[in-house]
Amino acid sequence: MDPDPDHNHRPNFPLQLLDSSTSSSSTSLAIISTTSEPNSEPKKPPPKRTSTKDRHTKVEGRGRRIRMPAMCAARVFQLTRELGHKSDGETIEWLLQQAEPAVIAATGTGTIPANFTSLNISLRSSRSSLSAAHLRTTPSSYYFHSPHQSMTHHLQHQHQVRPKNESHSSSSSSSQLLDHNQMGNYLVQSTAGSLPTSQSPATAPFWSSGDNTQNLWAFNINPHHSGVVAGDVYNPNSGGSGGGSGVHLMNFAAPIALFSGQPLASGYGGGGGGGGEHSHYGVLAALNAAYRPVAETGNHNNNQQNRDGDHHHNHQEDGSTSHHS
């Protein structure tokens, strides 16, 4: 059997395929090696940009990033650590709360949303300033009402509320109320202080004292001089040396102005030691003498109203009897 003459010349296809595959892999390795060579070289750092502007630091605050000078940012960071805040934005909000009154004074508007938690400080300060301004501008405040004005208002209100048949009883009670309220409104003050001139009622001069062994009491009722009288109280036992305690000041209301025409004390200004031997009136005696005409006037008005009421009642009875007859 003869071998096939084309058997030796038949191409071996699997071997050729293997050769081609190995050659392709070698070429791919060569490509990879050539591409990796440039990456191995170190990259040069970019040159630093030099700017003439001031350096700023970004600080987190209120949902966005803001820019501020480096000194301010350093202070904010320090305050965040000292106050124990969780973030720098909380520190900035705290700073705005502290500066809110100054911001409102400078711009007229606030920088923080209007809620009570953030505006507590500014609301408190503005409320106190408004109340102080109101007290300064009010002509007659709560603490400086004149006793005469308050009693007049009280009597008018009482007269409007009560019926007409109780007018005679209300007049007597109102006169008693007037006496008690005016006596309660007298302010006995020492040399420590006194009311301002604009708030003291218009009064007249009045001096009085007790017996010869007591110091002289000075009651300042002069509308032109409402301060404390300078110097010491006159002491009769000191022989004109000027010893004794401080001046006791009493501000009387307007009804005491009737004292200005009465010679209550004649020896209060004596230079010698015998000045206290002259006629001196006690404080209680002077006050009783002052208010006795007021009480008599009230009783006289009460009796007059009772007589008028009885006359009117008798006139009505006479008219009714004549009508029945």
From Swiss-Prot:
It is found in: Nucleus. GO terms for molecular function: DNA-binding transcription factor activity; transcription cis-regulatory region binding. Residues 1-64, 141-178, 296-325 are annotated as: Disordered. Residues 141-153 have a biased composition (Polar residues). Residues 52-106 form the TCP domain. Residues 51-63, 307-325 have a biased composition (Basic and acidic residues). One of its GO terms (biological process) is gynoecium development. Residues 20-36 have a biased composition (Low complexity). Keywords: Developmental protein, DNA-binding, Nucleus, Transcription, Transcription regulation. Induction: Circadian-regulation with the lowest expression in the middle of the dark period. Induced during seed imbibition. Induced by cytokinin. Disruption phenotype: Reduction in inflorescence height and pedicel length. Delayed germination. GO terms for cellular component: nucleus. Expressed in archespores, pollen mother cell, ovule primordia and megaspore mother cells. Expressed in young proliferating tissues. Expressed in developing embryos, and seeds during germination. Plants overexpressing TCP14 exhibit altered plant development and occasionally are lethal. Transcription factor involved the regulation of plant development. Together with TCP14, modulates plant stature by promoting cell division in young internodes. Represses cell proliferation in developing leaf blade and specific floral tissues. Together with TCP15, acts downstream of gibberellin (GA), and the stratification pathways that promote seed germination. Involved in the control of cell proliferation at the root apical meristem (RAM) by regulating the activity of CYCB1-1. Acts together with SPY to promote cytokinin responses that affect leaf shape and trichome development in flowers. Interacts with APRR5. Interacts with SPY. Interacts with SPL. Interacts with SRFR1. Interacts with GAI and RGL2. Interacts with DA1, DAR1 and DAR2. Interacts with SCE1. Interacts with MOS1. This is Transcription factor TCP15. It comes from Arabidopsis thaliana (Mouse-ear cress).
